């Protein structure tokens, strides 16, 4: 998927782009509890894989925010029509490998294809991000911990791939809450864009049957 190049002369955040690019740590990171009660119920009732169902929800919420599909390339900005996910897959020896998935299909079509791809990469594990790492959302999961903040390793110089991390969900009364972290490069992404991701994820998790 070849991205389009943005016209920086018409880009409304040009000053902010230049400002945050100068910083040693240009990342902004927000963790929020997402209500996944209905989504969790759907996975239980239909016997669906929980992580992959949450992944599909999150990646489609991220793809609905144009700023999260933008990447810094050289001195400019490119924007993808949609981005793929690259998530960690646990291996029997305690390490992990990466698995790249396209979440554009409906949930019902996505899950069997995703399960097959996870099985394939576990048989031949690799940390290769593929031909175009820029088109990826980096996704991790800490199902052992319910966290309220997280710090992630990032490269130098800074990249511009958003990072999404899930924690251990908790039951609070009749609600199921999942801690979700979104880390993004502030040269491209501001507070309203972060909020749009979380709003989109909760909306999808509240009505998961609409995306099946």
Where are these regions (language model features)?
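Gly/Ser/Thr-rich phosphate-binding loops and adjoining beta-strand/alpha-helix segments
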Residues: 3-6, 21-53, 69-83, 158, ...
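Acyl activation and transfer enzymes in specialized metabolism, enriched
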Residues: 39-64, 178-197
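Hydrophobic/aromatic-rich structural module bridging two neighboring secondary-structure elements via a short loop
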Residues: 63-100
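Helical lid/core segments from catalytic subdomains that handle acyl or acyl-like groups
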Residues: 91-147
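Flexible helix-coil linker/hinge segments at domain or subdomain boundaries
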Residues: 204-212
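Histidine-centered acyl-transfer/condensation active-site motif
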Residues: 131-144, 162-198
């Amino acid at each position: 998927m070849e991205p389009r190049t943005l016209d920086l002369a018409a880009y409304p955040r040009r000053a902010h782009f230049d400002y945050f690019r100068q910083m040693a740590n240009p990342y902004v990171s927000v963790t929020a509890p997402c209500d996944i009660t209905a989504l969790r119920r759907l996975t239980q009732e239909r016997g669906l894989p929980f992580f992959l169902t949450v992944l599909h929800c999150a990646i489609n919420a991220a793809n609905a925010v144009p700023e999260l599909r933008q990447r810094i390339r050289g001195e400019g900005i490119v924007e993808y029509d949609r981005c793929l996910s690259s998530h960690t897959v646990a291996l029997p020896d305690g390490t992990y490998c990466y698995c790249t998935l396209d979440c554009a299909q409906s949930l019902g079509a996505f899950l069997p294809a995703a399960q097959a791809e996870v099985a394939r990469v576990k048989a031949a594990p690799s940390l290769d991000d593929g031909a175009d790492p820029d088109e990826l959302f980096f996704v991790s999961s800490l199902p052992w911990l319910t966290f309220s903040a997280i710090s992630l390793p990032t490269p130098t110089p800074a990249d511009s791939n958003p990072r999404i991390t899930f924690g251990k969900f908790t039951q609070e009364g009749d609600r199921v809450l999942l801690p979700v972290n979104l880390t993004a490069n502030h040269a491209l992404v501001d507070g309203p864009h972060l909020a749009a991701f979380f709003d989109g994820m909760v909306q999808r998790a509240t009505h998961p049957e609409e995306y099946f």
